[in-house]
Amino acid sequence: MADPLYSSLKTVNSTSKVTPESLVFQTKILTPEEAKNVINEKIAFKPLLLVPSLNLEKQGDRKESVASKKRKKLSSKEKKKLQLNVVPKIADYSQFKHLHSMWCSYILEVIAGCTGESLMAKLAKAEYQGAYMQVLRSKSTTRVGLEGICIHESKHMLSLITKENRVVRVPKQDSVMKVIVDVPQRKLVFELYTQHLLLRAGDRSNKRFKSKNTIDL
């Protein structure tokens, strides 16, 4: 049996649904009493389902735009294209002195209060870009004695800028480096077996290190 409240409404398509919006529109042709009954029984105190805004954007384009907003870091391909990891052969040593002073402050905070194995673990996970290093021992005798500020560290190589404004590359494998922390309060010197650091600095910070035998060079 048809609802008497809808007897005065205009005929609509059988496929169309009656929505609160259509009811409000149709109440314009009802008597005030009929309109009041429709509103009280069909609309009042009921959740109003809002009609979503019309979006003609394709789903694929929407996913790409969302992905582009989420991605903030450069990919490896983009870094290579921009040559961000390319180390110049010649650079100005004086430009990296401030980097070294910042690194000295950083390493003092890292090793503060550490002794024994905890100190070794901290040094193994530390960042060495900015450290002043000297090659103590190496299988390549031509590299022994090279020293400078580390300006780039990769998985297998250390790049040092010497006081002669020359950039030299030292392999981590089969090398022993002397790291110097020279600050007004004190001067720290320690040996670093870089063959145990064959990881990128970012990956090394999350790795759990275990003591390993060191091959004498």
Curated annotation (Swiss-Prot):
Query: What name does this protein carry?
Result: Probable ribonuclease P protein subunit 1
Recorded source organism is Schizosaccharomyces pombe (strain 972 / ATCC 24843)
Q: Name one GO cellular component term.
A: ribonuclease P complex
**Keywords of this entry:** Hydrolase, Nucleus, tRNA processing
List the Gene Ontology MF annotations in alphabetical order.
ribonuclease P activity; ribonuclease P RNA binding
Q: Which GO terms describe its biological process?
A: endonucleolytic cleavage in ITS1 to separate SSU-rRNA from 5.8S rRNA and LSU-rRNA from tricistronic rRNA transcript (SSU-rRNA, 5.8S rRNA, LSU-rRNA); rRNA processing; tRNA 5'-leader removal; tRNA processing
Q: What is its main location?
A: nucleus
Is Cell membrane there in the keyword field? Answer: no
Does the record carry Metal-binding as a key word?
Answer: no
The family assignment reads: Belongs to the eukaryotic/archaeal RNase P protein component 1 family.
